[in-house]
Design a protein with these regions (language model features):
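An active-site-proximal structural segment forming one wall of the substrate-binding cleft
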Residues: 76-85, 103-129, 136-165, 184-195, ...
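N-terminal export leaders
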Residues: 1-6
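Acidic/histidine-rich helix-loop elements
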Residues: 55-73, 93-104, 237-262
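Active-site region of glycoside hydrolase catalytic domains
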Residues: 40, 147-262, 266-290, 307, ...
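Hydrophobic h-region of N-terminal signal peptides that target proteins for export
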Residues: 9-17
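N-terminal carbohydrate-binding accessory modules
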Residues: 20-86, 101-102, 275, 345
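Aromatic-rich peripheral "rim/lid" segments of glycoside hydrolase catalytic domains that contact
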Residues: 295-351
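Surface-exposed, active-site-proximal loop segments in enzymatic domains
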Residues: 62-66, 93-109, 130-145, 296, ...
Length: 351
């Protein structure tokens, strides 16, 4: 493993950066003796300009063959015009690494295009490393790959504007439990900070970014440029009914979304808000949605979606819907149109 880490460091040192103006991300103070204002606190400032987002391109053929891409550059403009201001780019990078954990130059060029096109459309961008199952199943094998990824991506985007955020890993879960995740973060965060001292990082707790695990998340007290994320799929029996990968919900059908469910969502977000205030950390709700291939009436899914969106906004959480295309669909790429009941639940009036 030591040899692998040394090799990955050498790769990172040789990784070219993408040309951006130097006015992007500067060095920021880590003094925290007093609670800074939003204008001075980088993470809170980032959170204040993020409002409504959508997850994109995680399972798009784009990453293997740009000619087969479903998602096109014009979709960034459609997202912006639809009332959204940021995208969470879902990256499964490990399969695009060689034996020394070097990222495929073609894959990196595709990523460059995604970041460039999203930024040109006026969208903020979260780069989300999404190999969470591989990392959770084998944390020791994952760590050098994850370090190599952020060494290379960090060096490449060191001069990107501050509208580009780095999410270190999506949804860690057992056996990558709280103590192991905190330990990994203690090594991973310095890797990113070596090239991106002023970059906003997105980091969430274990158990699939479960809000109940927030108290156990250990972050460097001196690093105030971290946006803490959680994911919100409760009531799971409703949102994942009929989903074949969700064992406890795969066989369910006709599960309603109830007023009791609405009350639980509010209570859950009250807990997140209390944690945010107590720890002086801004919070992002990075995923929520309801599976659309289950036969669940779209009216029920839209009501769930509107409830979550409304409560998130009432609590001051920017949010990202899961997802633009595929099985929690927001935009029908084949028919080139929004799924309007879901879009209206997310953006009741155009921004």
């Amino acid at each position: 493993m030591l040899l692998k880490c040394l090799l990955s460091t050498a790769v990172a040192l040789a990784t070219p950066s993408v040309a951006y103006p130097r006015s992007g991300v500067g060095k920021l103070s880590t003094q925290t003796s007093e609670r800074p204002s939003i204008a001075a606190d980088p993470a809170w400032r980032t959170a204040s300009r993020l409002h409504r987002g959508v997850n994109i391109v995680g399972y798009d053929p784009l990453w293997d063959d740009a000619q087969k891409a479903r998602f096109k550059p014009r979709h960034f403009r459609i997202i912006k015009q639809g009332g959204f201001d940021f995208v969470r780019v879902v990256l499964q990078s490990f399969k695009h690494m060689d034996a020394e954990y070097r990222l495929d130059p073609k894959w990196l060029a595709t990523l460059d295009g995604v970041v460039k096109d999203a930024t040109a459309a006026g969208l903020s961008v979260i780069l989300d490393e999404h190999d969470f199952n591989l990392c959770s199943e084998a944390p020791d094998a994952c760590e050098p790959k994850l370090i190599a990824f952020w060494e290379q991506v960090g060096a490449r985007y060191r001069d990107a504007p501050d509208t580009v955020l780095f999410e270190l890993l999506n949804e860690p879960h057992a056996p990558l439990d709280g103590p192991r995740w905190n330990s990994m973060l203690s090594r991973l965060i310095p890797v990113v900070r070596a090239t991106n001292l002023g970059r906003t990082l997105v980091i969430g707790p274990t158990r699939w970014n479960n809000l109940d695990e927030l108290p156990g998340l250990e972050l460097p007290k001196s690093d105030r440029n971290i946006l803490v994320t959680f994911h919100s799929y409760e009531p799971f029996r409703f949102t994942h009914q009929g989903a074949p990968w969700a064992s406890e919900a795969a066989g369910l059908k006709d599960v309603p979304f109830t007023s009791a469910d609405e009350a639980r969502i509010k209570a859950d977000y009250d807990k997140v808000g209390a944690w945010s205030r107590a720890n002086d950390r801004p919070v992002l709700m990075g995923e929520f949605g309801a599976y659309e291939k289950s036969g669940t009436p779209i009216e029920a899914r839209a009501r769930y979606t509107a409830t979550v969106r409304r409560e998130a906004e009432a609590h001051g959480f920017p949010w990202a819907y899961w997802q633009f295309d595929s099985d929690f669909i927001l935009y029908d790429i084949d028919k080139d149109r929004w799924v309007e009941p879901i879009r209206k639940a997310l953006v009741p009036t155009r921004r």
